[in-house]
From Swiss-Prot:
A lipid is attached at C17 (N-palmitoyl cysteine). This is Outer surface protein A. It comes from Borreliella burgdorferi. Its main location: membrane. Belongs to the OspA lipoprotein family. The gene is ospA. The sequence shown is that of strain B29. It comes from the Bacteria. The keyword Signal applies.
Amino acid sequence: MKKYLLGIGLILALIACKQNVSSLDEKNSVSVDLPGGMTVLVSKEKDKDGKYSLDATVDKLELKGTSDKNNGSGTLEGEKTDKSKVKLTIADDLSQTKFEIFKEDGKTLVSKKVTLKDKSSTEEKFNEKGETSEKTIVRANGTRLEYTDIKSDGSGKAKEVLKDFTLEGTLAADGKTTLKVTEGTVVLSKNILKSGEITVALDDSDTTQATKKTGNWDSKSSTLTISVNSQKTKNLVFTKEDTITVQKYDSAGTNLEGKAVEITTLKELKAALK
């Protein structure tokens, strides 16, 4: 009889344990929105260990975890069909999420994506040596910087995807991004330093002084003033919204005329360099 009761008790304990780790639903949890369009379910009550249960589904993969807080912060983990491990870390103040994928050993990082509340994000992919091989930085306004073929020294290919067109260039080992547009003898270079500071330069290989173009960059107004034979012809403004506008000077090169017009195609940008 004692063995029978002991067996019943063990079965009930297993059932209780199973219920404790079962998926959360709208009845026993609260839904919390996270940066990156993700949602986490937080249990309304603490478990037997005094912690709140967390449940989230990312890319059709169910992740589970626990937290001392009931606001949605904490760490959730899961495993993909290929045995690779997934980890989602939610900041205490819900200001950012970090989504990581590891190899089967749970230590070797395959990829990492950090997303902030303003919808900006940084995503990295890693090679066998654990070095960054690809990187994508998405700004809050949706424009982004894409880095590929990153070598051990940090250099690689670069691409800036703006609202309507794309600029291409290189990433230097010191973290400087250089994006170039060429039109005839003129080369426009947009440089983005590791700190985020932007500078723009114009070089012209034309040897005829009367038609040779020069550029003067004003960092305060983010404006490149283009001149021909020392006479101003137009302004290119690189706005905080990551757009480019063009406005011409009068024939004397002293006053701007008309209104600044947003450049929406690469063809229009090249035309502004003529």
